[in-house]
Amino acid sequence: MAAVSLSVSTVKPLGDRVFVKVSASEEKTAGGILLPDTAKEKPQVGEIVAVGPGKRNDDGSRQEPEVKIGDKVLYSKYAGTDIKLGTEEYVLLSEKDILAIVA
C-alpha cells in the first residue's frame, strides 16, 4: 500500500462533517501556574478549515451546511475524531456536534 501524505488541503470531509483546527489551550492558570498536558481541558473552540457537501435528506437532496470555512465554532467536548497534522491539532466532527458559531 502506498503512503498517503495528509495535509489540510487534501482532507475533504464527507456528508455533514466538518474539519476544524483546534484553538490552542491555556498553558497557565490565572494565578500563573503552568499546567501539565494531563491537567489541561480539551479545547472546545476552533476554526473550520473544510466543510463537507452536506447531509443527504430522505428524498436524496442535499441539505446545505449551516457553517462555512473560516467560521469560529464551539463544539461538544467529546465530539469527533482528533487528528494531528504536523504540530497542529484538528478534529473531524459532524455538523450536529457544533453548538454555536462564535462571533
From Swiss-Prot:
InterPro entries: Chaperonin_GroES, Chaperonin_GroES_sf, Chaprnonin_Cpn10_CS, GroES-like_sf. The keyword Cell inner membrane does not apply. GO terms for biological process: chaperone cofactor-dependent protein refolding. The keyword Nucleotide-binding does not apply. GO terms for cellular component: cytoplasm. Gene3D superfamilies: GroES chaperonin. Belongs to the GroES chaperonin family. Heptamer of 7 subunits arranged in a ring. Interacts with the chaperonin GroEL. Together with the chaperonin GroEL, plays an essential role in assisting protein folding. The GroEL-GroES system forms a nano-cage that allows encapsulation of the non-native substrate proteins and provides a physical environment optimized to promote and accelerate protein folding. GroES binds to the apical surface of the GroEL ring, thereby capping the opening of the GroEL channel. NCBIfam families: PRK00364.1-2, PRK00364.1-6, PRK00364.2-2, PRK00364.2-4, PRK00364.2-5. This is Co-chaperonin GroES. The lineage of its organism: Bacteria, Bacillati, Cyanobacteriota, Cyanophyceae, Gomontiellales. The gene is groES.
